[in-house]
């Protein structure tokens, strides 16, 4: 993402923190696909402040359909940009305790303020079964400006939409695998040249073939029809996708 685009995103975040609670979705091909097939999930994605493009292919899809230029600003990138700022109090929630411990250990080196911030392991359960009042009570007591959520899509987006009504303040951002990338324990993000070449999906397949092959096969099988349907909606003035 360009510096100008990043500044716009961070300006919106800073402005919202003073207004109240809200959330940002970081949209990749999986989220785009589910949102176009599940009206309730689409409402969740469109119900946040805005969405940013996680996948390098999402801006290409949108350019093909709408003829507009969109920029990629992936979850792991905005995550590290905000951590490096040393500007906000943050709350980290999701994933396993081992990953959270590794994440905290590594982030303290980059931002010493992280040592005094909260890392909360969410129990493994259906998204409808969380005690959102109790979770919000923890976050509100903490006074966090930024709440990082790592539960994986589509669960994390639904989680944020359900938690929002109980929060007094804070911008929630769903960052998926970013916790794992920076914990030093599990999968790492692809090298920069791989990302720029739009080959990150191949890197992820090599690192985790069982999980990623299934996801990629599903996207490849459904994407052509999805793009054509959205193209027709756009030309009929009935697009389901808000501007990202």
Predicted regions and their residues:
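Proline-aspartate-enriched helix->loop->beta-strand connector
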Residues: 139, 143-148, 153
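Short, flexible loop segments at boundaries between secondary-structure elements
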Residues: 122-127, 170-205
């Amino acid at each position: 993402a360009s510096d100008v685009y990043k500044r716009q995103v961070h300006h919106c975040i800073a402005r919202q923190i003073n207004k109240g609670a809200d959330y940002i979705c970081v949209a990749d091909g999986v989220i785009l696909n589910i949102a176009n097939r599940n009206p309730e999930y689409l409402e969740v994605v469109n119900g946040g402040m805005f969405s940013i493009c996680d996948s390098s292919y999402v801006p290409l899809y949108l350019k093909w359909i709408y003829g507009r230029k969109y920029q990629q600003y992936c979850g792991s990138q905005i995550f590290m940009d905000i951590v490096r700022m040393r500007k906000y109090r943050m709350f980290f929630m999701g994933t396993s305790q081992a990953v959270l411990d590794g994440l905290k250990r590594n982030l303290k080196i980059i931002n010493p303020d992280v040592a005094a911030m909260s890392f909360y392991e969410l129990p493994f359960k259906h998204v409808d079964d969380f005690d959102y009042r109790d979770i919000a009570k923890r976050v509100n007591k903490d006074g966090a400006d930024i709440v990082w959520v790592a539960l994986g899509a589509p669960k994390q987006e639904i989680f944020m939409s359900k938690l929002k009504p109980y929060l007094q303040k804070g911008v929630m951002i769903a960052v998926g695998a970013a916790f794992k990338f920076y914990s030093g324990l599990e999968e790492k993000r692809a090298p920069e040249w791989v990302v720029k070449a739009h080959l990150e999906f191949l890197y992820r397949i090599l690192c985790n073939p069982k999980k990623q092959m299934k996801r990629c096969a599903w996207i490849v099988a459904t994407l052509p029809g999805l793009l054509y349907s959205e193209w027709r909606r756009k030309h009929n003035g009935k697009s389901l996708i808000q501007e990202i």
